[in-house]
């Protein structure tokens, strides 16, 4: 069967002006990233003869025009139609395509450490292959790894979990979505402080739950106001998702604030908490990390999520985990058994080696964190010198979430209007050839996210490009 494909113009995110040779003509056309809906022309062979069947889309049905009329329903489920594609993935993919086409784009959109996986971890993975550890593992993960995670949580986080209260998955993202699916019923509410990681609201929608967004402000370092949380709680409130250190802001919740939040949570029997702690080791003193489940009364209602991608530079190894009360972990385990089954045996052997590097990853992780801190300090200083920029200094992770809204409401010759974070990021890609993520992807349209998971020299070049591009924009005089 041969098929030719054309693309509808629905479902697109305005973003780029570059035409890339060899790619679909609409996938990187001026100002757009496209998510295609396909129309097909089918060519079939039958009884030695060939009939052309041309299709057109009518609503959600493809009408096959031939001697025989066949209708094929290509509609998608309401669930998947309610979910937005990830902007961070789309922008990262587009920036990569531009680079491959010869456009010298500096990519600061992806949340991926630029360091190689530490050598002892790599060696453990290689040895796993050589020694024949290449078969299926138990769905929940190997006992060796779950025991190592149990020890880590006890020593580093003050949390007591047995191996059967831990589930290893193909990345922390899988751990989170399985938890949301396990505890949420249709109509339940999932409370999410904004700015948020792009996937949290979509995960709630996939579970037929309703995301309830709790806005924060840059003046308060993007930290959740406990009073706002309490005002938004209803009988439908089922889940609160916390991320500290935060993607996209780098904010770190101090213990005192977490205790205030815990006091509110304790008054609501239905309310559970997912504590996303994937960036726990990428933290800058004097900030410290507190696991939410370690607070009084919170162990029974908290699902702690972590993984190996960020601190150990193991993004491609795809390994995360969740720990919590056995009742909830068993439910997540059941879902995983029907989704993916167990995670990679090779990655699990490598993860055991990662946890064996020492407390908080030892010197290898400390060296990476030192570099991240130097980069953060450079960016905070550099952007602090630019007129109209507001900054909340990150205390962890490797993102700078800066307010550039003073540059909105401007018409730029040869480009057009800059009215929001998306058009500003598109302008910076077009004018400065720097790929960033608009803040509206994270629930705050006043800001843009810059990943400093790149070398200092790369960041210096990016800052110079951004400064030159912003010079042509005259920010409105503050009232």
Swiss-Prot record:
L-aspartate binds at residues 111, 197, 247, 449. Its EC number is 2.6.1.1, 2.6.1.78, 2.6.1.79. Pyridoxal 5'-phosphate binds at residues 172-173, 247, 279, 307-309, 318. CDD domains: AAT_like (cd00609). The keyword Transferase applies. Its main location: plastid. Homodimer. This is Bifunctional aspartate aminotransferase and glutamate/aspartate-prephenate aminotransferase. It comes from Petunia hybrida (Petunia).
